[in-house]
Curated annotation (Swiss-Prot):
Subcellular location: Cellular thylakoid membrane
Transmembrane segments: 12-32
Name of protein: Photosystem I reaction center subunit VIII
Organism: Prochlorococcus marinus (strain SARG / CCMP1375 / SS120)
Role: May help in the organization of the PsaL subunit.
Lineage, opening ranks: Bacteria, Bacillati, Cyanobacteriota, Cyanophyceae, Synechococcales
Keyword annotations from UniProtKB, A to Z: Membrane, Photosynthesis, Photosystem I, Thylakoid, Transmembrane, Transmembrane helix
Gene responsible for this protein: psaI
Pfam families in the cross-refs: PSI_8
Cellular-component GO terms for this entry: photosystem I; plasma membrane-derived thylakoid membrane
Highest taxon of source: Bacteria
Gene Ontology biological-process annotations: photosynthesis
Signal sequence coordinates: none
InterPro entries in UniProt: PSI_PsaI, PSI_PsaI_sf
Length: 38
């Protein structure tokens, strides 16, 4: 794998991945917090 390939390919994968995973993790943490304090 060349560095040029990684430079074009990694952001294209990680940006949407982070955009989907971050809210999902946030929701899970809130859900656990709510159930733990309930």
């Amino acid at each position: 794998m060349s560095s040029e390939f990684a430079a074009t390919w990694l952001p294209a994968v990680f940006v949407p991945l982070i955009g989907l995973v971050t809210p999902a993790v946030f929701i899970v943490l809130i859900g656990r917090y709510i159930t733990a304090t309930d």
